């Protein structure tokens, strides 16, 4: 359990949360674990087997404190709100921001800055762990290109230029991604990103993990009360969760790509876990999907330092924190969206 940005996050199975006068009491299997004055909380977010008593739910609804329920995998299930919700004002601000090019450009620029910086951290780590000088030099060159992208980003005045810088950084990155594959490289060779359908094993693996990550970012946006389809970096299209795609950019390399590389390099996944369909599409078999999903959930439990909060939090909570930071900017409670910077 964590309290971040006036939000109580409950993740421990068999947790009971009840209201005792003006104090929220948290018990796990009958043992009192934490007591929090109710006025310290703005919202409560539950994951998995967490029970809130009716008096607490009713009081939160009365006070306009948001309660959000996710399943144990982080999928959004429900929100409990009082009769008059502040979400309508948040969503109005979210839509209004589309006509404010200065605000949307600033948000998009910082999202891309977070993505490129985090990607560069992964590349630099790959260079340090490289088995040979050729791989090390190639990855160091990619890191330099990503640094140039960050420098260009600070001078980019409009959204199209920002998107162009992001796309160029992604091309450099994927051109050398397989340099970080240390075992069975030929079976997991990748030179560029392809999807719908993926045409090689690494792209199939990345697509599956990206789908898991997108689901988490959808849940983060919905849990805060944002419209997942109204984003600022990705182009708006009918049925496309543009905001969730925006949120996930900061986490692609550090969560999804690092996990894919770890699974391959530790031989937890190999070529036998994939099936090639007629036409060249490559799919992951069901057993491997289960193993990958389990590994993904474990990765989300690892703690990382959040630079804005200056404290360690589970990696799986960071998309939820970022969604709340973005909501603060849209409401006017903060001037700038600060992306998550991985260390």
Curated annotation (Swiss-Prot):
InterPro entries: Cas1 (IPR050646), CRISPR-assoc_Cas1 (IPR002729), CRISPR-assoc_Cas1_C (IPR042206), CRISPR-assoc_Cas1_DVULG (IPR019856), CRISPR-assoc_Cas1_N (IPR042211)
Classification via Pfam families: Cas_Cas1
Sorted UniProt keywords: Antiviral defense, DNA-binding, Endonuclease, Hydrolase, Magnesium, Manganese, Metal-binding, Nuclease
EC number: 3.1.-.-
GO molecular function annotations of the record: DNA binding; DNA endonuclease activity; metal ion binding
Record's keyword annotation contains tRNA-binding: no
Enzyme class: hydrolase
Highest rank taxon of the organism: Bacteria
Cofactor: Mg(2+); Mn(2+)
Disulfide bonds: none
Binding site for Mn(2+): 166, 234, 249
Oligomeric and partner information: Homodimer, forms a heterotetramer with a Cas2 homodimer.
Family: Belongs to the CRISPR-associated endonuclease Cas1 family.
Protein name listed in UniProt: CRISPR-associated endonuclease Cas1 1
Species of the source: Moorella thermoacetica (strain ATCC 39073 / JCM 9320)
Gene it is expressed from: cas1-1
């Amino acid at each position: 359990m964590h309290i971040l940005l006036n939000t109580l996050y409950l993740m421990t199975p068999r947790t009971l949360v009840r209201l005792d006068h003006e104090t929220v009491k948290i018990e796990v299997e009958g043992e009192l674990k934490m007591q929090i004055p109710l006025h310290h909380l703005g919202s409560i977010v539950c994951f998995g087997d967490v029970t809130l008593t009716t008096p607490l739910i009713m009081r939160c609804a009365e006070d306009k404190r948001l309660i959000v329920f996710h399943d144990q995998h982080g999928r959004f299930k429900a929100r409990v709100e009082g009769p008059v919700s502040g979400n309508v004002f948040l969503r109005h601000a979210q839509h209004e921001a589309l006509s404010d090019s200065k605000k949307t450009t600033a948000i998009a620029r910082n999202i891309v800055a977070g993505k490129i910086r985090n990607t560069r951290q992964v590349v630099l780590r790959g260079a340090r762990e490289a088995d040979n000088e050729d791989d090390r030099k190639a990855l160091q060159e990619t890191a330099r290109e990503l640094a140039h992208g960050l420098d260009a980003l600070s001078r980019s005045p409009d959204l199209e230029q920002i998107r162009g810088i992001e796309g160029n950084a992604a091309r450099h990155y994927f051109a050398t991604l397989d340099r970080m594959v240390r075992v069975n490289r030929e079976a997991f060779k990748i030179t560029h990103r392809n999807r719908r359908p993926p045409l090689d094993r690494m792209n199939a693996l990345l697509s599956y993990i990206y789908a898991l990550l997108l689901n988490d970012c959808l849940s983060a946006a919905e849990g805060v009360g944002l419209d997942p389809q109204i984003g600022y970096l990705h182009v708006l299209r009918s049925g496309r969760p543009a905001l969730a795609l925006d949120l996930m950019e900061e986490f692609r390399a550090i969560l999804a790509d690092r996990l894919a590389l770890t699974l391959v390099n530790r031989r937890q996944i190999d070529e036998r876990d994939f099936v090639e369909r007629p036409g060249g599409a490559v799919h992951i078999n069901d057993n491997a999907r289960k193993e990958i999903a389990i590994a993904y959930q474990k990765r989300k439990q690892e703690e990382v330092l959040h630079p804005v909060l200056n404290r360690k939090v589970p990696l799986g909570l960071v998309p939820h924190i970022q969604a709340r930071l973005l909501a603060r900017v849209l409401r006017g409670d903060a001037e700038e969206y600060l992306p998550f910077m991985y260390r």
